[in-house]
A protein has these predicted regions:
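PEST-like low-complexity, intrinsically disordered acidic/proline/serine-rich tracts
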Residues: 1-137
Length: 137
């Protein structure tokens, strides 16, 4: 799970995640749309979501094979029948995260993991750069 700051912007038809790490932008469509037929696999995939009270439930398809390996080291096939279901639950001071990875190529049952973040309403996304003077090189 990414330790870098994350900004969440809720709009009428989507929720946008701005990740400091590699400046990644993730759009979670909440208007019922489905992935276009010609959508290609990417690290972020194609995400659709809906709200269940204070929990954003997100299903992501079209994930590239590098996705899970990059984050956790766990194998991930990226086959057309793979997908994730994530739950983001907001409390007074935390964002709780649970993900289920559905990949029949590698797992007989969904692979599940959870994590949490402390909410920092005044936090800011900063430039993500690798500076030699800060890396010890």
């Amino acid at each position: 799970y990414d330790p870098y700051p994350l900004e969440i912007i809720q709009q009428e038809h989507q929720v946008v995640f701005l990740h400091e790490h590699f400046h990644m932008v993730r759009r979670i469509f909440t208007d019922g749309r489905q992935a276009p037929e010609n959508w290609w696999p990417t690290l972020g995939g194609f995400s659709v979501g809906h709200w269940e009270e204070d929990t954003l439930v997100v299903k992501t398809t079209h994930l590239s094979p590098e996705n899970l390996v990059w984050h956790t080291g766990m194998p991930f096939s990226g086959a057309p029948d793979t997908y994730t279901v994530e739950r983001y639950t907001f409390t007074d001071d935390r964002l709780m995260y649970t993900a289920e990875i559905f990949d029949p190529t590698y797992y007989e049952e969904p692979y599940v993991f959870s994590a949490g973040r402390v909410l920092a309403p005044d936090g800011m996304i900063l430039e993500y750069e690798c500076y030699p003077e800060y890396s010890g090189f």
